[in-house]
Each structure stands twice: as C-alpha cells, then as structure tokens.
C-alpha cells in the first residue's frame, strides 16, 4: 500500500495511492493516472502532493514535487502530539490524540503514512466519514496544522508557559 524511500535530502517519501482514471471521447477512452504522495523529514515537517499524468511514473514524480513544495511545520512533543486535535476536509473527519511512549502509531491507511513521515511515533487516531485517501490526508494535515504548542498558546495569550501548563 504505502511505499517508502529515502532521498539525499533526508526526506521520507511515501506513495499512498495510484489510481487509473479515464476520459471518454468520441474515439474511445483515454486513460490517465493519479498519484497521492506524502513527504516528510521525520522531525515535524510534512507535505502532500497529488499528481496527474498519462503514465504512472510521471504522475508519481509530479505528486512528489508538489509535496515538497507544500510542506508545513508541525510542533511535536517527544514524538507525539501536543494535545488532542480534530481535522476536517469535505466528508472526512479525523481525530488524533497523544499517546504514551511505546504505543506506536494506531491509525489506518493514509493517516498512518502522514503521521509516519511527520515524525510522530506514538498516537491514537481515527478517521470518520469518508475514507477517500485524498480527503483523509487533507483532514490529517488540517488537524496537524491546527495543533498549538504551549509556547504558541502562551505567546498568543501573553502569559508564561508555566501558567499555560498549570505548573
């Protein structure tokens, strides 16, 4: 399902889905391919790409390039999330919550690939609604983008990190 390879820049690349689509014209059908990929450095940076082309390798290459261009930073907390987060994209809803050391990535399919390349090692996650890989990936990235570190919350509220954490 998910194919992984290391690159010179130490980015992890995962191929989540390849799909054959067709366009019907007067002379018959024209087939093309779509590819969904995620790219991450395993340390809080992650991006996804969706490429379309007449051949599979070209679609994968386009998707990888788009993924590298659209990377976001995720504030992780020792290999897990800062707090429980929800992400939504069209019909897909995802819920992710931090887990203790040794739990692993408890998530399905497309969500697992995103969390692995982002550098999350311990998380409990569930996808609700549509399980279309494109929508699940977008919802997962939406949830990760909406996650705030205690430092970010403290800066927004004008308080110290200790006040936010209740220490």
UniProtKB/Swiss-Prot annotation:
The superkingdom of the source organism is Bacteria
- Pfam family of this protein, just one? Ribosomal_S5_C
PROSITE patterns noted in UniProt: RIBOSOMAL_S5, S5_DSRBD
Q: What is the effect of changing residue 112 to S?
A: In strain: NEA-319; neamycin resistant
Q: Which InterPro entries match?
A: Ribosomal_Su5_D2-typ_SF (IPR020568), Ribosomal_uS5 (IPR000851), Ribosomal_uS5_bac-type (IPR005712), Ribosomal_uS5_C (IPR005324), Ribosomal_uS5_N (IPR013810), Ribosomal_uS5_N_CS (IPR018192), Ribsml_uS5_D2-typ_fold_subgr (IPR014721)
Recite the UniProt keywords alphabetically.
Acetylation, Antibiotic resistance, Ribonucleoprotein, Ribosomal protein, RNA-binding, rRNA-binding
This entry carries the following GO cellular component terms, namely:
cytoplasm; cytosol; cytosolic small ribosomal subunit
Which processes are annotated in GO (biological process)? Answer: cytoplasmic translation; maintenance of translational fidelity; response to antibiotic; ribosomal small subunit assembly; translation
Signal peptide start-end: none
Q: Tell me the function of this protein.
A: With uS4 and uS12 plays an important role in translational accuracy. Many suppressors of streptomycin-dependent mutants of protein uS12 are found in this protein, some but not all of which decrease translational accuracy (ram, ribosomal ambiguity mutations).
What family is it from? Belongs to the universal ribosomal protein uS5 family.
What does the entry note on its domains? The N-terminal domain interacts with the head of the 30S subunit; the C-terminal domain interacts with the body and contacts protein uS4. The interaction surface between uS4 and uS5 is involved in control of translational fidelity.
- NCBIfam families per UniProt: rpsE_bact
**Subunit structure comment from the entry:** Part of the 30S ribosomal subunit. Contacts proteins uS4 and uS8. With proteins uS4 and uS5 encircles the mRNA as it enters the ribosome, which may play a role in mRNA helicase processivity. Can be cross-linked to mRNA. In collided ribosomes contacts ribosome rescue factor SmrB.
What extra comment accompanies this record? Altered uS5 proteins have been identified in a number of mutants. Some mutations in uS5 have been shown to increase translational error frequencies. Some mutants in this protein can partially suppress an alanyl-tRNA synthetase mutant.
Q: What protein name is recorded for this chain?
A: Small ribosomal subunit protein uS5
Organism in which the protein naturally occurs? Escherichia coli (strain K12)
Organism phylogeny: Bacteria, Pseudomonadati, Pseudomonadota, Gammaproteobacteria, Enterobacterales
Name the gene behind this protein. Answer: rpsE
């Amino acid at each position: 399902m998910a194919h992984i390879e290391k690159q010179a820049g130490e980015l992890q690349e995962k191929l989540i889905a390849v799909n054959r689509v067709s366009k019907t014209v007067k002379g018959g059908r024209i087939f093309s391919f779509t590819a969904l990929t995620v790219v991450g450095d395993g340390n809080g940076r992650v991006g996804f790409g969706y490429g379309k082309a007449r051949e599979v390798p070209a679609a994968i290459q386009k998707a990888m390039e788009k993924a590298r261009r659209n990377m976001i930073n995720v504030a992780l907390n020792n290999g897990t999330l800062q707090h429980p987060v929800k992400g939504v994209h069209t019909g897909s809803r995802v819920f992710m919550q931090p887990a203790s050391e040794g739990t692993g990535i408890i998530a399905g399919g497309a969500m697992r690939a995103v969390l692995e390349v982002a550098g999350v090692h311990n998380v409990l996650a569930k996808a609700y609604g549509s399980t279309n890989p494109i929508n699940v990936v977008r919802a997962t990235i939406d949830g990760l983008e909406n996650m705030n570190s205690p430092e970010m919350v403290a800066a927004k509220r004008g308080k110290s990190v200790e006040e936010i954490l209740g220490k």
